[in-house]
């Protein structure tokens, strides 16, 4: 029988997630801030074991079937590990895994190829979910944790284009989460001006092959953010974050934060001062001017 002391302990919610390549490399600080944020929420996060690259744009642009098999292997691993809900941080990874989930459920020949490569077919037992689905129901938790209200920050929420396109694949309606995430950011002390570019494309991987075109796309996003009265952008995608800070030529850049970084700043989570040092557009002058850092 459990003692009264152990029985009274609050059980941590366990969440399984797919890390993806960016979280382990170019967006490593995003990953660190996410883990600190989940700890604040009382959530224990575990990575999918033995995961591989989802294929992202390079693979599915060259060989769609091979890209589906890459993502499909991750779904098989999740099934083997008894994972019902697999949370994904990166929108690009989310779309690739959702695509594999849909394709393997309807294309028997491709599922047979997966079985030949990996030893079994995918049975369709995994739900692929996007990480903000967890965050959207936790504003009260974060409000109680605020030690450093982020007053003076005015950030527009930027989701990018991948989450909702193509709709028949993602089946993801961002609108209810957009309202909830706006409220979450507001409890941190951040104003969230309305704007119409929250789902516009940043150029994605075209930044490598058609950088001039992407510069124009990013300039339009920055221009509309500034016209809305924003002094920063809040992004949910590692690639969008890089493009919005690195690309663009005509419009003065804005700092681009991840929502987990803002939570870390407001709650003074361990390491929060180091995360902002890694940005391509240094947010420290803005944060220092507002006496937030």
Q: What do these predicted ranges mean?
A:
Residues 2-293:
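Iron-sulfur cluster-binding electron-transfer modules in prokaryotic oxidoreductases
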């Amino acid at each position: 029988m459990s003692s009264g002391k152990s029985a009274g302990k609050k059980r941590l919610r366990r969440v399984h997630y797919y890390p993806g390549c960016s979280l382990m490399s170019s967006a490593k600080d995003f990953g660190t801030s996410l883990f600190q944020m989940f700890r604040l929420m009382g959530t224990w996060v575990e990575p999918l074991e033995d995961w591989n690259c989802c294929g992202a744009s390079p693979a599915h642009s060259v060989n769609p079937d091979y890209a589906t098999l890459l993502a499909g292997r991750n779904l098989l691993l999740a099934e083997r590990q008894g994972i019902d809900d697999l949370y994904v941080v990166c929108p690009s990874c989310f779309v690739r895994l959702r695509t594999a989930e849909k394709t393997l459920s309807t294309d028997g020949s491709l599922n047979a190829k997966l079985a030949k490569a990996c030893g079994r077919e995918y049975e369709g037992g995994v739900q692929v979910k996007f990480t903000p689905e967890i965050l959207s129901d936790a504003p009260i938790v974060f409000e109680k944790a605020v030690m450093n209200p982020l007053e003076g920050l005015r950030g527009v929420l930027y989701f990018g284009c991948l989450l909702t396109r193509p709709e028949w694949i993602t089946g993801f309606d961002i609108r209810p989460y957009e309202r909830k995430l706006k409220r979450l950011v507001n409890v941190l002390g951040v104003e969230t001006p309305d704007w119409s570019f929250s789902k516009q494309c940043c150029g994605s991987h075209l930044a490598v092959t058609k950088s001039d075109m992407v510069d124009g796309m990013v300039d339009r996003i920055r221009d509309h953010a500034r016209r809305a009265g924003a002094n920063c952008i809040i992004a949910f995608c590692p690639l969008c974050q890089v493009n919005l800070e690195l690309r663009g030529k005509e419009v003065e850049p804005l700092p681009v934060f991840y929502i987990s970084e803002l939570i870390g700043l407001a709650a003074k989570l361990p390491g929060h001062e180091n995360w902002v040092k890694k940005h391509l557009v240094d947010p420290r002058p803005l944060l220092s001017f507002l006496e937030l850092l």
